[in-house]
Amino acid sequence: MTQDKYAYIYNKVKDALETDKLFLRPELSLSLLSRVVGTNTVYLSKAINNGFGCSYSQLINCYRINYLIEEAQRTGENIALLAARCRFWSRSTFFDVFRQHTGMTPHRYMENVRRSSFPKHMHDHEGQRIIIEKG
């Protein structure tokens, strides 16, 4: 597959996630996203790996955590309710994913946000800033 095709798929994925907020749909899967984008799952997976620098599940979780944090800051809504709306059905999975992306528990993160002008960017489990988009 050509670089132009990968770039096209990358842009379609980005649009589906950012504009259509597909990551909030309960039935979202790699297969569904491939149909929305208009490609097969192999090309989609490769385009995600190359364009976003992560796997499909890491990408979806990153969008979900970013959305959850933005909504919690904007509305003050309970973070556990937001986690369910963001399709984190297991509390332990949510806590693990949240900690991987922020470096702390949801409660501690929100306390820091409320107390100060705590940076609102995300980190992966090694303390590196998460890059949603290369380039």
Language-model segment annotations:
Residues 1-11, 50, 54-55:
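Short, Lys/Arg-enriched, Trp-marked, Pro/Gly-tolerant hinge/linker segments that flank
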Residues 14-28, 48, 52, 69-77, ...:
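Basic, amphipathic alpha-helical hairpins
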Residues 28, 32-34:
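A short alpha-helical element within helix-turn-helix/winged-helix DNA-binding domains
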Residues 31, 42, 78-81, 91-92, ...:
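Residues within helix-turn-helix
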Residues 34, 45, 83-84:
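The alpha-helix within a helix-turn-helix
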Residues 35-38, 87-88:
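Central "turn" residue of the DNA-binding helix-turn-helix
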Residues 50-86, 112-135:
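Terminal helix-turn-helix DNA-binding modules in bacterial transcription factors
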